[in-house]
Each structure stands twice: as structure tokens, then as C-alpha cells.
Regions:
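Short aromatic/hydrophobic "clamp" motif used to bind/position activated sugar donors
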Residues: 93
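Glycine-rich, basic loop-to-helix element that forms the pyrophosphate-binding segment
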Residues: 70-88
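Cell-envelope/extracellular polymer assembly enzymes that use nucleotide-activated donors
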Residues: 2-4, 33
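Short, acidic, metal-binding catalytic loop of nucleotide-sugar glycosyltransferases
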Residues: 22-31
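A conserved acidic beta->alpha catalytic loop
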Residues: 22, 38-49
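Short beta-strand/loop segment that forms part of the nucleotide-sugar
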Residues: 31-40, 69-71
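Conserved donor NDP-sugar-binding/catalytic core segment of glycosyltransferases
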Residues: 103-137
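Short, flexible, basic/aromatic active-site loop/helix in glycosyltransferases
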Residues: 142-166
């Protein structure tokens, strides 16, 4: 089973480098192509990622490949991810944020789970803060008020609504 993943970067070389390194370090069970797409970062993130690739900072392991693409204009997060779609020959593709930090072979685990559940077309892992607390995401009904309330821990009455997202 072949995997691919894409991280879109805008002015975030250090963060994207760490994310890419954890993806490469932990994704070992299945072949992986990791795409890093720079969205025309004025800080030179794209060129820095290319240099990291050539210097070995983004060292691909056995069965892994790293591809850096630099866009000439910032078309946004979706456009950056869509850029790689024509190149894909993977069985499963992952859209990753540049702040992701893997601590296990999560991509292989998700792909294996998807393989065992062919009726499912999309999945995501549980997201946690560095201290292990779950991150609340507005995945069911995205509205401004709940998004604001989730940021205010003093509003304990809102906890029931937050629990619906776990």
C-alpha cells in the first residue's frame, strides 16, 4: 500500500521542517511520498526546504521520497494541496498542517484502518496538545459563537458542547 502526504507552507520553514522530519521518522510501514508545497513565502521557506532536502536535513528513509514544490503565488491552503493531486499514485493521501508533530506511525495506522473499512472515505486522527489534552475541533456545526466559547475555559457550561466533538 502506497501513501502520500502534503504539507503546505507559508512563512513557516522551521515548523514545516519539524513536521516533515516527524512524518519521515515515524511513517515506516508503508512507502511514502511526502510533498512540501511552499505557497510563495516571502521569507524564502521554499528555498530553505529545497536546501534542507539537498543537505540531508529531510532525509528520506527506505521506501520514502520527499518532493518540494515552490509556487510563484499564494493561492491559499487548498490550492497548495491541489497542486500535487495530478502527481499522486498513492492508495491513501494525507493533508497535513505544518504544525503537526507525529509521535507514532499514525499515517500507516490510519491507512491500515481505512483498508479494513472500505465503506469509509475520509478519516482523521485524534488531535492532542503537547501535554496530552484533546484539541476541540468544530467538525459538526461550524459557527462563530461555539468557536469563541471553546476558547474561554471559564465558561464551564459550554463543556457539554465541547464533549460532542470528541
Amino acid at each position: 500500500m502506497k501513501l502520500s502526504a502534503c504539507i503546505v507552507v507559508y512563512n513557516g520553514y522551521d515548523e514545516a521542517l519539524k513536521a516533515a522530519q516527524t512524518v519521515l521518522r515515524f511513517t515506516r510501514r508503508h512507502p511514502l511520498t511526502l510533498y512540501l508545497v511552499d505557497n510563495a513565502s516571502p521569507d524564502g521557506s521554499g528555498q530553505k526546504l529545497e536546501a534542507a532536502l539537498h543537505s540531508g536535513l529531510l532525509a528520506a528513509g527506505e521506501g520514502q521520497q520527499v518532493v518540494v514544490r515552490c509556487r510563484t503565488e499564494n493561492g491559499g491552503f487548498g490550492t497548495g494541496h491541489n497542486m500535487v493531486l495530478p502527481e499522486l499514485d498513492s492508495d491513501y493521501h494525507f493533508i497535513l498542517n505544518p504544525d503537526i508533530q507525529l509521535t507514532a506511525d499514525t499515517l500507516s495506522d490510519l491507512a491500515d484502518w481505512m483498508e479494513q473499512h472500505p465503506d469509509v472515505v475520509m478519516a482523521r486522527p485524534a488531535l492532542v496538545f503537547p501535554d496530552g489534552r484533546p484539541q476541540q475541533l468544530p467538525l459538526r456545526r461550524c459557527a462563530l459563537r461555539p468557536m469563541v466559547y471553546r476558547q474561554l475555559p471559564a465558561l464551564r457550561f459550554w463543556a457539554k458542547y465541547n464533549d460532542a466533538y470528541l
